[in-house]
């Protein structure tokens, strides 16, 4: 089940938080509860993706994305993700989550998030390719930033991210049709 109560807590805690600019990091703090575990008594991979929502959605509010989305009746959807799991997170571990905008192109906003365990080790990292969507399809992220009144151009896409973006262009769709 989706952690609605935890999300409500994050939205409440961040309701009057300082606005973020491009590249600023949103930090949030969480606990891995027993219902977040898999059969090996560590954070379930699928649940980790859900927990990343707890950082990403308040981040969207602090970045001004949510205001523009609601005003225009648009939505923000995850169009792709690349995940790394490196350290185990177990029951009752405290997690520090960090979220930031990396860059954008004419179709997607690239957001990265990481989870840090109580030993200050990076336990996981995810990069999202997010699309803003209106009734006519995908909206250029630059339009969002213009409406937020942030006169930013996208930072240069890092090489490590460029590799993933380029590989997605070569990936067959629909899959498993060869």
Identify what each model region corresponds to.
Residues 1-16, 22, 89-96, 100-178:
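HotDog/MaoC-like acyl-thioester-processing domains
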């Amino acid at each position: 089940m989706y952690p609605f109560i935890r999300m409500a807590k994050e939205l409440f805690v961040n309701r009057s938080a300082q606005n973020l600019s491009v590249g600023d990091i949103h930090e949030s703090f969480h606990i891995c509860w027993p219902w977040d575990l898999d059969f090996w008594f560590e954070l379930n991979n699928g649940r980790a993706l859900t927990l990343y929502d707890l950082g990403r959605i308040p981040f969207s509010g602090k970045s001004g994305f949510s205001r523009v989305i609601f005003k225009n009746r648009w939505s923000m959807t995850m169009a792709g993700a690349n995940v790394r799991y490196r350290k185990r997170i177990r029951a009752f571990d405290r997690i520090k989550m960090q979220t930031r905008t990396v860059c954008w192109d004419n179709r997607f906003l690239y957001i990265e998030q990481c989870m840090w365990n109580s030993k200050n080790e990076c336990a996981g990292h995810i990069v999202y390719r997010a699309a803003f969507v209106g009734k006519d399809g995908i909206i250029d992220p630059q339009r969002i930033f213009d409406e937020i009144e942030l006169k930013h151009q996208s930072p240069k896409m890092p090489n490590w991210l460029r590799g993933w973006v380029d590989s997605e262009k070569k990936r067959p769709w629909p899959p498993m049709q060869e």
